[in-house]
Amino acid sequence: MPVLHNRISNDELKAKMLAESEPRTTISFYKYFTIASPQQTRDALYQVFTALDVFGRVYLAYEGINAQISVPQSKVETFRQQLYTFDPALDGLRLNIALEDDGKSFWVLRMKVRDRIVADGIDDPSFDASNVGDYLKAADVNAMLDDPDAVFIDMRNHYEYEVGHFENALEIPADTFREQLPKAVEMLREHADKKIVMYCTGGIRCEKASAWMKHNGFNKVWHIEGGIIEYARRARAQGLPVRFIGKNFVFDERMGERISDEVIAHCHQCGAPCDSHTNCKNDGCHLLFIQCPQCASKFNGCCSEQCCEELALPEEEQRRRRAGRENGNKIFNKSRGRLNSKLSIPDPAE
């Protein structure tokens, strides 16, 4: 039986990807459908994807599939055909093509089986995830933005909303999607008679959120087909005004796609206009934050003087300090609370 996981080091894989001459296309897709055997499906898909030199991150669960990948451009159509014929439920599936793409978004293929393709925290047997809101296409989105009876709800995390969002969209202040769902219901009670329009990056979160809102008694619920990515693509193709302001955060090496010229965020260290996310270079921190080029130079890519000083220590001393810390100091921590405490940023929810 072939090896169904990667055995090559990340550094070697990244160097190999960067040396590739053929351009790649970054693609995301999802589908809520019943998978009887997620592990078996994962293993079969792994072989298909590996044969096509696909890199990226793929989650499978009994409820469906969620993928962010990159594919060699010469193999995109073959990939599409093999995906569509793999399972009847995937035939004709919409593939979201990246709006800005340097082809360097991923360098390894990771496929995992999870309890859910989106961690929602829902434990209600009466919840019907298939009873979703109506889809909105690009022209309909723009019309809704001009409708005084419509309320746009951003179902992404705080660090995504900070760098870009639709005009006048409401942010649901929470660190995770599972925390957002009950808060969205609570916050929107006063807008129960309004038209609720939900959106996210590619559609997977807002689709489930729309079903959750309907489950909680909201009757006029829509969600944007294909999320921000598909909206911007269709609006541009159709010559429509793009009403999303700023940058669309993405979960790969690019960390963002420019949608409009406006920069609506600020450097977390000096306050200068900036919407470029980075992870603190201190391996004992890796905080996700916004840093301008000047502060990146001043702090050597770190989020604080403390991390900058620690990064300058001998590697052995850095490892010793990391080993002595509590497990709660999570790598790649994106929580608003940790961001606020490390960089002294006021919490807008307070």
Swiss-Prot record:
Provide the GO biological process annotations: tRNA modification
Alphabetized GO MF terms: oxidoreductase activity, acting on paired donors, with incorporation or reduction of molecular oxygen
Q: Which reaction does it catalyse?
A: uridine(34) in tRNA + AH2 + O2 = 5-hydroxyuridine(34) in tRNA + A + H2O
**Entry keyword Transferase:** no
Q: Where is this region: Disordered?
A: 319-350
Question: Which keywords fit this entry according to its UniProt record?
Answer: Oxidoreductase, tRNA processing
Protein name according to UniProt: tRNA uridine(34) hydroxylase
What species was this sequence derived from?
Salmonella paratyphi B (strain ATCC BAA-1250 / SPB7)
State the family named in the UniProt similarity comment for this chain: Belongs to the TrhO family.
Task: Cite the source lineage.
Answer: Bacteria, Pseudomonadati, Pseudomonadota, Gammaproteobacteria, Enterobacterales
* EC annotation from Swiss-Prot or TrEMBL: 1.14.-.-
